[in-house]
């Protein structure tokens, strides 16, 4: 006789399963998970390689730091050393803070760790203990700066004032003279910019834009695979050039010859003769999409950057690849050239900026301050400085070694393009269609613009891919995702009274990396 199996509801079966599972693991409840040493070592090795791989080779300190300091002489900090008696240690007069910045790149040797950072009371007692003449002489001795040990990309550090001792009866009442708090300069007033023309004609995203040196016309490249030349004064289409088989990502007009250069996602770099409107040269070598290009201002050299993680230097006339600039670990998004050293600057999706030696074809400096992809770099036309843009952040740097100047925060979007004019107006354009205008010197954001998309486009097609000032710097052109080119000009009716600078100085502006 077959025994019938008792049937239970699904609810009861689930709870019984939960109880069996609980009884099985109740003994291990609350205990820490045992650490696997081998997997932990591998994880740390991978993390070190991924995050610190590009900066493994740090600058070394000078050899003279390893030499023994003679007696009756000043040490490498500029501090006076006194001869030691038998059984007595050498005492140091500390007149300032430690000259070596606490950053990477300074080797900790017997000389660099010999002194400790003095407290205010300790420095004051040392100054009181010495004769007035000796203390004054030592206090006035200049402390050598630690700039030569500064890691590339680190900000300049100002040395605080040293101990100053009064003469005569006030010798015992010496004190450390506090340095005056730094004052922030007031931003220069700039008139706001307003939209006055929208030019349509492309059938796809407008990805790049350039103005010709004569300021008569400008050229755009688009995702519709065409290059269009427009009259700058009227905004009318003059010419369309076809030849690329994919999105055109970069265009530039030569100042030395009647040539137009273009690059695209079809891996091609083309040279167009504008007298015949035909392609006369191809530059072959990139293995993937070419994202940008720039011409050297003084020699016939073209530089391109690509998704294949390299930038290439081309001889314009012979079409030969002079150098392949390798070192980036991800797509190179932007490249800029200048006549002074360093002559080539690249920004990449690997979050780094590299300054290159054009002659040797090697990296001079690698800047690792950005935390996200660097999609835009712009050089100031007058100052020896440049700016770089990544999502949510713009940074300013100083040539030739890439010293960090300041952050420009507030444009919370993916920044695709940067441009600056000689008056110090920096423009940043982002993928959400917003455009911010900044004062270059102070980093003050004086205007924010978000133009409406053209009728028939989606709001999500609001994005700025490229922007440029014309040669007179009176007009600003933007290439956008709604298939249009927008032209802005300064508001002639604006004054400092109608559009005042809404600026409040901070007591101390933090320099963040």
Curated annotation (Swiss-Prot):
The modification N-acetylmethionine is found at residue 1. Keywords: Acetylation, mRNA processing, mRNA splicing, Nucleus, Phosphoprotein, Repeat, Spliceosome, WD repeat. The modification Phosphoserine is found at residues 119, 200, 390. Its main location: nucleus. PROSITE patterns: WD_REPEATS_1, WD_REPEATS_2, WD_REPEATS_REGION. It comes from the Eukaryota. It is found in: Nucleus; Nucleus speckle. The keyword Acetylation applies. WD repeats lie at residues 201-240, 243-282, 285-324, 327-366, 369-409, 410-448, 459-498. GO terms for biological process: mRNA splicing, via spliceosome; positive regulation of G1/S transition of mitotic cell cycle; protein localization to nucleus. Pfam families: WD40. One of its GO terms (cellular component) is DNA replication factor A complex. Disulfide bonds: none annotated. The keyword Lipid metabolism does not apply. CDD domains: WD40 (cd00200). Identified in the spliceosome C complex. Component of the PRP19-CDC5L splicing complex composed of a core complex comprising a homotetramer of PRPF19, CDC5L, PLRG1 and BCAS2, and at least three less stably associated proteins CTNNBL1, CWC15 and HSPA8. Interacts (via its WD40 repeat domain) directly with CDC5L (via its C-terminal); the interaction is required for mRNA splicing but not for spliceosome assembly. Component of the minor spliceosome, which splices U12-type introns. Within this complex, interacts with CRIPT. Also interacts directly in the complex with BCAS2 and PRPF19. Belongs to the WD repeat PRL1/PRL2 family. Involved in pre-mRNA splicing as component of the spliceosome. Component of the PRP19-CDC5L complex that forms an integral part of the spliceosome and is required for activating pre-mRNA splicing. As a component of the minor spliceosome, involved in the splicing of U12-type introns in pre-mRNAs. PANTHER family: PLEIOTROPIC REGULATOR 1 (PTHR19923:SF0), WD40 REPEAT PROTEINPRL1/PRL2-RELATED (PTHR19923). This is Pleiotropic regulator 1.
């Amino acid at each position: 006789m077959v025994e019938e199996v008792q049937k239970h509801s699904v609810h009861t079966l689930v709870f019984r399963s939960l109880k069996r599972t609980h009884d099985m693991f109740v003994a291990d409840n609350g205990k820490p998970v045992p650490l696997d040493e081998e997997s932990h070592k591998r994880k740390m090795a991978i993390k070190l390689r991924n995050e610190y791989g590009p900066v493994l080779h740090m600058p070394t300190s000078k050899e003279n730091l390893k030499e023994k300091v003679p007696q009756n002489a000043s040490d490498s900090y500029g501090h006076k050393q006194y001869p030691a008696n038998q059984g007595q240690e050498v005492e140091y007069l500390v007149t300032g803070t430690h000259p070596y910045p606490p950053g990477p790149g300074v080797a900790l040797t017997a000389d660099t760790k010999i002194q400790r950072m003095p407290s205010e009371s300790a420095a004051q007692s040392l100054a009181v203990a010495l004769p007035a003449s000796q203390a004054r002489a030592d206090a006035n001795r200049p402390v050598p700066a630690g700039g030569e040990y500064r890691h590339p990309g680190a900000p300049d550090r100002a040395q605080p004032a040293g101990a100053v001792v009064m003469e005569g009866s006030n010798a015992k009442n010496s004190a450390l003279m506090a340095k005056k708090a730094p004052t922030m300069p007031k931003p220069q007033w700039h008139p706001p910019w307003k939209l006055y023309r929208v030019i349509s004609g492309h059938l796809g995203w407008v990805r790049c834009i350039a103005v010709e040196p004569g300021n008569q016309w400008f050229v755009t490249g688009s995702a519709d695979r065409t290059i269009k030349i427009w009259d700058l004064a009227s905004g009318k289409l003059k010419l369309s050039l076809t030849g690329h088989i994919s999105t055109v990502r970069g265009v530039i007009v030569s100042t030395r010859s009647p040539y137009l250069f273009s690059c695209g996602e079809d891996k091609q770099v083309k040279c167009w003769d504008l007298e015949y409107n035909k392609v006369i040269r191809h530059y072959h070598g990139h293995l993937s999409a070419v994202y940008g290009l720039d011409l050297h201002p003084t020699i016939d050299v073209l530089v391109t950057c690509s998704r294949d993680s390299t930038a290439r230097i081309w001889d314009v006339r012979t079409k030969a690849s002079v150098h392949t600039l390798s070192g980036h670990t991800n797509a190179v998004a932007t490249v800029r050239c200048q006549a002074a050293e360093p002559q080539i600057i690249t920004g990449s999706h690997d979050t780094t900026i590299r300054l290159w030696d054009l002659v040797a074809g090697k990296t001079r400096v690698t800047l690792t301050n950005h935390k996200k992809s660097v999609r835009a770099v712009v050089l100031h036309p007058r100052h020896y400085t440049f700016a770089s843009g990544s999502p949510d952040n713009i940074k300013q740097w100083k040539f030739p070694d890439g010293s960090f100047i300041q952050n420009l925060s507030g444009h919370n979007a993916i920044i695709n393009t940067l441009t600056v004019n000689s008056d110090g107006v920096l423009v940043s354009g982002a993928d959400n269609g917003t455009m911010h205008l900044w004062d270059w010197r102070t980093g003050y954001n004086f205007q924010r613009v978000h133009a409406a998309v053209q009728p028939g486009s989606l709001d999500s097609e609001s994005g700025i891919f490229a922007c440029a000032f014309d040669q007179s710097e009176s007009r600003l052109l933007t290439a956008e995702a709604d298939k249009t080119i927008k032209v802005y000009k300064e508001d002639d009716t604006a004054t400092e009274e109608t559009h005042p600078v809404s600026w409040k100085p901070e007591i101390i502006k933090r320099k963040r990396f």
